[in-house]
């Protein structure tokens, strides 16, 4: 069954809802039940212990809870903010610890190396999940219209 094309007005509404939804913090973090079996996470956990895995999930929650789903760490203030946000359960992080942790994450491919080198902490999988969710919300705003496959998130790579 072929999908009908959107009218210009419908496309504008879809794009508006899509953009609004993609830039909002998420209330819920969807992840696979076997996420711990991810090769990069297994390698990192084997080398650094379960604390590393727990810290990774704290960062995932933080990324999901931020509008735009990324951290700007181009300067000392950005690193200090991340350190404060990573501090949980009585464990205080320093900016240097955050830098070391994120460098390791980039090395494992858990955050995007190229964007990290530009001072942005971004996880591509989170971006894809946010876009998938946003497309579903935007489609529902048009009475259940279903969008085609994901187009990628060019905005993140701009």
PLM feature spans:
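Winged-helix/helix-turn-helix nucleic-acid-interaction surface
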Residues: 1-40, 73-81, 87-158
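Short, mixed-charge amphipathic alpha-helical segments
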Residues: 37-50
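Surface-exposed beta-strand edges and their flanking turn/coil or helix-capping segments
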Residues: 43-44, 58, 69, 134-138
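Alpha-helix C-capping/helix-to-loop hinge sites
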Residues: 44, 62-66, 85, 89
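Short helix->loop/beta-hairpin flanking segments within DNA-binding domains
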Residues: 47-78
């Amino acid at each position: 069954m072929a999908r009908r094309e959107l009218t210009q007005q419908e496309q504008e509404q879809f794009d508006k809802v899509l953009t609004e939804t993609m830039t909002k913090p998420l209330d819920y973090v969807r992840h696979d039940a076997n996420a711990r079996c991810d090769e990069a996470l297994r390698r990192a956990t084997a080398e650094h212990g379960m604390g590393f895995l727990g810290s990774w999930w704290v960062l995932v929650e933080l990324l999901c809870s931020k509008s735009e789903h990324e951290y700007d760490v181009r300067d000392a203030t950005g690193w200090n903010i991340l350190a404060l946000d990573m501090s949980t359960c009585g464990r205080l992080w320093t900016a240097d610890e955050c830098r070391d942790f994120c460098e390791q994450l980039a090395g494992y491919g858990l955050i995007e190396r190229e964007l990290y080198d530009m001072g942005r902490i971004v996880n591509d999988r989170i971006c894809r999940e946010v876009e998938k969710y946003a497309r579903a919300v935007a489609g529902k705003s048009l009475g259940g219209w279903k969008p085609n496959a994901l187009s990628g998130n060019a905005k993140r790579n701009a």
